[in-house]
Amino acid sequence: MKTENQSAPPDILPVCRSKEEAKQYYDRISKVYDFLAGAFERKYAEIALQRLSIERGEIVIEIGFGTGHCLKQMAESVGEEGKIYGVDISSGMLEVARSRLKKAGLLERVELYCGDAAVLPYDDSMFDAAFMSFTLELFDTPEIPAVLEEVKRVLKPGGRVGITAMSRENGDSRMLRIYEWAHKKWPVFTDCRPIYLERSLVDAGYGIRNREKLKLSGLPVEIVIALKKTGV
């Protein structure tokens, strides 16, 4: 049962499909996802990865890894001394990502898990960095704080998180209104919806290191690098 979040901004649309529906949808499109949406999203994911500045030997988690393009880049960045962990709700996406990593000879550096990011199967303070690209906005509004808390739990003190998301901040463009109309009409197909990314991270107790505002086909996008405060 969904709970009401009294502090949630009223202009954030709800997610009107279940997680099981999301899983089935992404399983179905996993082999063609790169053709359908991957090329549009990849540019912004790569910018966020550059800002996150993953270093050799680090332990990093990606939530919502999709077809594995970013996992591959991160595995190359951490080298043999590091380790990448990936979580995705779709077993179909996991198989596509696994195939990509195997083909690149990087599978030994990556551990993949099919499950819900709201409950991560990892120890406290395990990761140097975390990454999400067009994933946080797939969670319903009351669940976003819980996901960010769970990410914070598994980050080391001073660890960083890089997130790319569709943005509702200062957003009232015609393209945004059309997209939100499509989200209401086809909630499974158009399941991303704009959120307040920086505000959500601040509310969850993160420190903001960097924020950029960009456009994706006229739709506002935020890239934020945030830090888990020491002593938390």
Range-by-range predicted roles:
Residues 1-31:
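N-terminal, positively charged/glycine-rich alpha-helical extensions of SAM-dependent methyltransferases
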Residues 145-157:
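A short glycine-rich, Lys/Arg-flanked "PGG" loop and its adjoining helix->strand segment in the class I
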Residues 39-56:
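Conserved alpha-helix/loop element of class I SAM-dependent methyltransferases that forms part
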Residues 189-205:
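Short alpha-helix
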Residues 61-119:
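Class I SAM-dependent methyltransferase SAM/SAH-binding core
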Residues 205-206, 210-232:
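Core SAM-dependent methyltransferase catalytic element
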Residues 118-130:
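A short acidic, Gly/Pro-enriched loop at the edge of an enzyme's catalytic core
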Residues 158-165:
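Conserved beta-strand signature within the Rossmann-like core of class I S-adenosyl-L-methionine
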